[in-house]
Amino acid sequence: MLLFAGGKNAMKLFSAEGHADRLEPNLRSTAKTMMLIYIGFTASGTAAYGILGMNWFDALNHAMAALSTGGFSTRSDSLASFNSLTIEMVTIVLMLLGTTNFAILALLLKGRFRTILKFGELRLFSFILVLSIPILTASGLYVIYQNMADSLRAAVFQSVSALSTTGFSTVDISTLRADMNLLLILLVIIGGGAGSTAGGIKYSRVYVLFKALIADIRMRFLPERIVSESYTYKPQGKIYLTTKYVADISRF
């Protein structure tokens, strides 16, 4: 719709979708760039699935569903139907791409890796995965699987699927313990990155609110002269966590 909208209305629509970062100087160019990135990743995912043995109908559907973090499958038992480690790996990559801010993806394609490493929201995303995967691995080993490799494989896939709010599965969710399902639900609630196709609260919002909370605590208990203004890095540069910015993050 941004390709046909213009002026203030286009900017309002763009902001309402959660895309705070422009990839190009104007919104129409930004929309075209986002569309090209999306089409490119979808085509690459479809080709990868096809090479790994999926028929082209399944390949296209799963590539679109993984990248859009929609999680729709042509099979009743989702990705478990294929029982393929390589297909699961491709799906994980597509889900990770889908849950990442489009502006960050643009920086990634430009090779600006040092800039990307500054983004605290990505560090939080990695921390959540590093924390949840061992928990699910241990629980899966205790309940379902007989060896560590299979349990780890399932834990990695389910963690990424839940945190990206995709919903693909390689296990029967009804066989999981209540604590495992609770962890997966929490991951879904946290959700993916702002400006991505993922749902949930968004881990980028969680990161900003956490930093704002820490800053508020420091201001209350430490001398004002030693408390520096809190900030976060976004694709457009350093953003200071002002009261207005935190309020906007909290509302949308």
Residue spans of the language-model regions?
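Membrane-proximal intracellular helices of multi-pass ion channels
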Residues: 1-252
